[in-house]
Amino acid sequence: MGLQCGIVGLPNVGKSTLFNCLSNAKAQAANFPFCTIEPNVGVITVPDERLTKLTEIVQPKAVVPNVIEIVDIAGLVKGASKGEGLGNQFLANIRATNAIIHVLRCFDNDNVIHVDGSVDPIRDKEIIDTELQLKDLDSIEKKIQKVEKMAKTGGDKEAKKTFDVLTVYKNHLLSGKSARTAPVAEEDKEYIADIWLLTAKPVMYVCNVDEGSVSTGNAYVERVKAAVKEENAEVLIISAQIEAEIAELESYEERQMFLNDLGLTESGVNKLIKAAYRLLNLATYFTAGVQEVRAWTITQGFTAPQAAGVIHTDFEKGFIRAEVIKYEDFVKFNGSEAIIKENGKLGVEGKTYIVQDGDIMHFRFNV
């Protein structure tokens, strides 16, 4: 679906180390290739144990996993909103993404200098927040100038509503808060859709900790959790140092042994990719046949015809019905369609069916 998460963070917080770990195919549980579109963009396999299980049952000729694009966004300094440093490029890159992964330094290490001289993840967060908020204020001011006259003098109800919504966002941003927490009804957000507010994008915070804090967190992490409570954002604890060590290991077995020794069940990279998928409000359905078992990415809430359209637009246009098997039932009956039917577990769904995460689907269509 071409959806992107952008990784942001100040210099020396571990952002590039994490991106490099993500961009290393060896660091992923399944050996699907990582490819680079350009130096700072990676297409990364989404780990999914269900796909592995379906592959074991069906034994297909080909397996196609879900992927997600991760963008390493460089160039943030104080003043980026005014174009300082690589500010203009930074802001253009972040505007193109669908969600933000914000990496914060939550470890002490005298050998790794901090751009501001001391470790303070809340200050670091606020530096980036402020630059994005300033850029959003600039975008809002420009739009207000366009609609203000019509809103105040004419009888243009649309302009009046747009002006009112923009004013709510403006006051919220002026109070030092991000657009995503503004008290605006979901249906009113369409009034700002054309100005692509940076701080309206969903965000996740990654606390980069030392090796000893990866299981439990530390005082820095607790401060971050308290600071982002209002945003209802996910906070992940990852050690970029550990992830870099994992990336050096050759085999999946070696990586699992290494994680077990640390008391971890999966790598931080895997956790991060899965969390990014959730952040983008995505879901997965599967098609399963001897030629191919494949994971398909959809937005949560897609109807059956919309989901069919992800495979090919003809599937959506000529949609007749969808045959649906729940993942749990497919596994329980070892993929036998005959037994699944006998047990009444093969659903036949029409155009209004909302596809559920994990559904195994077969579409009937006529073009």
Which positions does each model-derived feature cover?
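Short, flexible surface segments
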Residues: A96, Q356-D357
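Switch/coupling subdomain of P-loop NTPase systems
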Residues: R95, A99-H102, F107-K135, S139-K142, ...
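Conserved nucleotide-binding/hydrolysis micro-motifs of P-loop NTPases
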Residues: N24-A25, R50-L51, G75-V77, R105-N111, ...
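Flexible beta-alpha connector loops of hexameric P-loop NTPases
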Residues: L76-K82, G117-L132, A151-K157, G212-S213, ...
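Amphipathic, soluble alpha-helical interaction motifs
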Residues: I57, I100-V103, E131, K143, ...
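Short amphipathic alpha-helical segments
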Residues: A30-N31, V112-D116, G217-A219, L249
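Conserved G1/Walker A P-loop phosphate-binding module
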Residues: M1-I113, I122, E141, V147
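C-terminal-of-GTPase-core extension/linker across diverse P-loop GTPases
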Residues: G2-V8, V13, F19, K146-I354, ...
